[in-house]
């Protein structure tokens, strides 16, 4: 008897990809058009009210995020008219399919990854990371609320808007082992990493490179959570929990190792 064996699937596989450069350039331009003006508007307001914002940097960050979220939602509203087939996942997940637990667990793992990647020299030397965070009660509350809200802002823009748009304009899928996401998610993960380019100007080179790498990987995970749950809620939770817990850990170390 002859036994037929199916050919092994390659470990990395691209399927149905129709790559076109102009949608990727459009996504990069749209990313900056959403992020930069909103941030500069918040900066202008902060300059006008310098007496308050100089002592409450978290409020400036939060204000910029509010403006960026509103800009992202406005672009999604336009996209729904221009590209009605584009998925935005701006919905509550179906009951039992929200991946809330995995989102929380992934957020904790991401916080640990960022803490080590960003601050490993200080951690090894038992020297407090100088994150510059205000550790007064109001400062702690402000920073944690703002960081926990980062997922609402960035997932709306990067996964809801940009992945949704490119899913239609650059269709296809990419699979690595059992990890399977739309090709648009891979493209936007690259853009998500590039959005952190300012770290090359203000941080040591090793830290900037680490931030690029983990931002790219996190971007892939956020897309996976979004597609599996059919909602932005799980990636928003993972993103916000990761950012908030890393900042909380840095604040604890600032106090424990006597940096004010």
Predicted regions and their residues:
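Alpha-helical transmembrane segments in multi-pass membrane proteins
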Residues: 21-82, 102, 129-133, 137, ...
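Juxtamembrane "helix-exit" motif on the non-cytosolic side of transmembrane helices
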Residues: 38-49, 117-124, 197-203
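Membrane-water interface of transmembrane alpha-helices
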Residues: 71-84, 156-167
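Residue-level signature of transmembrane alpha-helical cores of multipass secondary-active transporters
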Residues: 28, 103, 107, 143, ...
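Structural signal for membrane-spanning alpha-helices in multi-pass inner-membrane proteins
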Residues: 35, 39, 75-80, 114, ...
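Helix-boundary and loop/linker segments of multi-pass membrane transporters
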Residues: 13-18, 91-96, 130-140, 174-179
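Short, Lys/Arg-rich, polar N-terminal cytosolic tail immediately upstream
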Residues: 1-17
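Transmembrane helix-loop-helix hairpins at the membrane interface
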Residues: 118-119, 139-260
